[in-house]
């Protein structure tokens, strides 16, 4: 039970942080449009994204909501039923779930996602905290899978 409560609390914390930052962006950043954060490196720029990453699938809100919900249910299943005792995998899935739900809340309530981080040193999409959580979580998840494969190969070669 502690396993479930801890992971639920972690997911809720990520969602809360995401929603608080987005609330700040709407109230403070939207009226001014943009402001420097780290000069010549990062600016805070208010953008409403009607699609997913890079505005892909803009105008397909129902599809995005259904597809995202299905993916998040699969991630939640993996977190709560398949990752006991695997802390790195749990961390990865908590990040993906928290970030995914944060953006899903925006999409369901507003039809678009609030983005606000703009990298000035490279041409890239404006993104948000939830996007960072999802990307770091997926990268960590890939690392976990890779490490599991390496461990399985080592175990198999030692048994031969």
Model-inferred region functions:
Residues 1-160:
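Alpha-helical transmembrane bundles and membrane-interface segments of multipass inner-membrane proteins
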């Amino acid at each position: 039970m502690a396993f479930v409560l801890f992971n639920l609390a972690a997911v809720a914390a990520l969602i809360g942080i995401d929603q608080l930052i987005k609330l700040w962006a709407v109230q403070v950043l939207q009226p001014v449009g943009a402001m420097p954060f780290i000069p010549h490196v990062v600016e805070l720029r208010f953008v409403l994204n009607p699609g997913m990453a890079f505005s892909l699938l803009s105008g397909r809100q129902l599809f995005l909501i259904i597809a995202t919900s299905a993916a998040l249910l699969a991630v939640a299943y993996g977190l709560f039923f398949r990752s006991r005792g695997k802390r790195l995998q749990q961390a990865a899935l908590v990040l993906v779930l928290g970030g995914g739900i944060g953006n899903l809340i925006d999409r369901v309530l507003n039809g678009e996602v609030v983005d606000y981080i703009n990298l000035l040193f490279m041409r890239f999409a404006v993104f948000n905290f939830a996007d960072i959580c999802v990307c770091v979580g997926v990268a960590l998840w890939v690392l976990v899978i890779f490490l599991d494969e390496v461990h399985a190969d080592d175990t198999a070669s030692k048994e031969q």
